[in-house]
Design a protein with these regions (language model features):
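Bacterial Sec-dependent N-terminal signal peptides
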Residues: 1-14
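Accessory carbohydrate-recognition regions in carbohydrate-active enzymes
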Residues: 13-180
Length: 184
């Protein structure tokens, strides 16, 4: 019993930071089906950028070679090779609001994209916004730092999700208070 107590103390005495050896961008290349975003072990949230959402290539909604971010979704499947989740796309924006399907997307330089376990950040050049993401086991936290306070907004897209083809989605703004949509 005493030997077990000594051995268990040594196992928990290791204060090394092993996260510095983790590169969340590994596996993000074409058809890797992994994402670089923030998540926690056994957590329900995997918040990450979306660079595409149509076709098998985008099962995790992120491909490293892309240069356009559609927004940030709150849950992903990592490395599965199948499409699901990718719910609640959120995107900070500036300028005139639009109903255009792709009007809120933004380019980003790879030199200003950073990820470590539990944290992701990127600078969106079109929107002129720094986006930072982190996660708890049940909640995603987003922080947006705008270069200018003029015409800032946050788009929340409840319809977004990965799809085999773009015909799987349909939505129609019937009025300012009524949205009709379906996903197959």
């Amino acid at each position: 019993m005493g030997l077990f107590g000594i051995a268990s103390q040594q196992a928990f005495a290791d204060n090394n930071d092993y996260t510095k050896y983790v590169d969340p961008f590994v596996g993000n290349a074409d058809n890797g089906h992994t994402f670089p975003g923030a998540c926690r072990p056994f957590g329900m949230i995997q918040t990450s950028p979306v660079t595409g959402g149509v076709g098998w290539r985008y099962c995790a909604e992120y491909v490293y070679s892309d240069s356009l971010i559609w927004g940030f979704t709150q849950d992903h499947l990592n490395g599965t090779g199948c499409m699901d989740l990718g719910d609640i796309l959120v995107m900070p924006s500036t300028g005139k609001r639009t109903r255009s399907w792709d009007g809120y997307r933004s380019h980003f330089p790879k030199t200003q994209e950073f990820a470590t376990p539990g944290y992701y950040s990127v600078y969106l050049t079109d929107a002129k916004v720094k986006a930072e993401l982190t996660a708890t086991p049940h909640v995603a936290f987003h922080r947006y730092t705008y270069d200018s306070a003029d015409s800032t907004s946050v788009l929340i897209d409840l319809q977004h999700g990965p799809a085999w083809n773009d015909k799987q989605y349909h939505s129609q703004a019937v009025s300012y208070t009524h949205l009709r949509a379906h996903e197959t």
